[in-house]
Amino acid sequence: MDSNSNQKPKIGVLLVGHGSRLPYGEEVINGIADIYRQEADHPVAVGFMNMSRPSIPEAINELAAMGVEKIIVTPVFLAHGVHTKHDIPHILGLDNGAEGHHHHEHEHEHEEFEFDGEIVYTEPLGADPRIAEIIRDRVKSAI
């Protein structure tokens, strides 16, 4: 029996941000990635949908170059919207050609990536008690 048959695929994590001409969002997403990396046992990359670098395809290529076989993509957005439901899946090649109703182009959407492994796309952050705790802390510090 092959000893590799029971091995799990090498996993990478891609945190996706919107991107901006201003540096603040990029700094926050990179800061979140740095915190996550401290306890992660797999490679972590950051990619941006628009206006910032690295783009989502560039980040996928970065993870692929590390030999990952499965990429878990997490949008660092609070809620679903056009970007999480249409634009990001389209960039990831997960939309099966669905057009949606969003008709402006994004700077990175025509870039390609070289990855033939599995891509798993997660939900955005959502209504999570940990986010409510952050809000409580902000309110408490402002009182």
Swiss-Prot record:
Subunit structure, as described in the record: Homotetramer; dimer of dimers.
The record's comment on protein family reads: Belongs to the CbiX family. CbiXS subfamily.
Cited Pfam families = CbiX
PANTHER family according to UniProt: SIROHYDROCHLORIN FERROCHELATASE, CHLOROPLASTIC (PTHR33542:SF3)
Protein name listed in UniProt: Sirohydrochlorin cobaltochelatase
Signal sequence interval, chain numbering: none
Binding annotation for Co(2+): H18, H83
Q: In which pathway does it act?
A: Cofactor biosynthesis; adenosylcobalamin biosynthesis; cob(II)yrinate a,c-diamide from sirohydrochlorin (anaerobic route): step 1/10
Disulphide bridges: none
GO MF terms held by the record: cobalt ion binding; nickel cation binding; sirohydrochlorin cobaltochelatase activity
Q: Which residues does the Swiss-Prot or TrEMBL record annotate as the active site?
A: H18 (proton acceptor)
Instruction: Name the Enzyme Commission number(s) assigned to this protein.
Output: 4.99.1.3, 4.99.1.11
Ordered alphabetically, the record's keywords are: Cobalamin biosynthesis, Cobalt, Lyase, Metal-binding, Methanogenesis, Nickel
Binding sites annotated in the UniProt record for substrate: R53, L78, A79, H80, G81, V82, H83
Record-level GO BP terms: anaerobic cobalamin biosynthetic process; methanogenesis
Reaction it catalyzes: Co-sirohydrochlorin + 2 H(+) = sirohydrochlorin + Co(2+); Ni-sirohydrochlorin + 2 H(+) = sirohydrochlorin + Ni(2+)
Q: What start-end ranges are recorded for coiled-coil regions in this protein?
A: none
Protein task: Catalyzes the insertion of Co(2+) into sirohydrochlorin as part of the anaerobic pathway to cobalamin biosynthesis. Involved in the biosynthesis of the unique nickel-containing tetrapyrrole coenzyme F430, the prosthetic group of methyl-coenzyme M reductase (MCR), which plays a key role in methanogenesis and anaerobic methane oxidation (Potential). Catalyzes the insertion of Ni(2+) into sirohydrochlorin to yield Ni-sirohydrochlorin (Potential).
**Where does the chain bind Ni(2+)?**
H18, H83
